[in-house]
């Protein structure tokens, strides 16, 4: 898993961060770190720090970054609308999400902090479909679409309607899209307990390589 993570993150960084042909206005990113879910106690340790540090690195590399912390459903909707509106034809569009994610009907949903999830239908009502978001980004003309999803955590919601966490689902993505999960499909990972998740730690390490 570590070798694969390093290889894929290296590919992502090399394909985007080091591409000189994209001006700042042609690189847009939405970075979300959700840690304070009322149904989760204590709050997650890693998502906000991961999001802040990644946002800073992306800004240094020429991205126009929108950073959200502990975002409600309304805040995520508005931020996604802003992201879609900032995309120019051929642009690089990057989405990073750290928090809880849930699989439903073979799609992965990113969960805002104010979600009210008691049954599986609530996931589709309150969550944000990754597949739908990537389709919208593609429809706005982005040339390179990147989704970095650190949401395969065991969460407090699924135990209400499942015997075990289902992890995240494979995504049917448009061409020119790179999707990277922090764990294998349908698998779950625990927080490291440190300042950064392993996923974010390796991503930041790749971005900070001198010369990129």
State each model region's role:
Residues 74-98, 102-160, 191-199, 204, ...:
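Caspase-like (clan CD) cysteine peptidase catalytic core
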Residues 174-202:
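The feature captures the short pre-catalytic strand/loop hairpin that immediately precedes
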Residues 55-59, 169-174:
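Short, conserved catalytic or adaptor-binding loops enriched in Gly and charged residues
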Residues 27-29, 209-212:
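Caspase-like cysteine protease fold
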Residues 159-167:
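Short, surface-exposed loop/helix-turn segments at secondary-structure junctions
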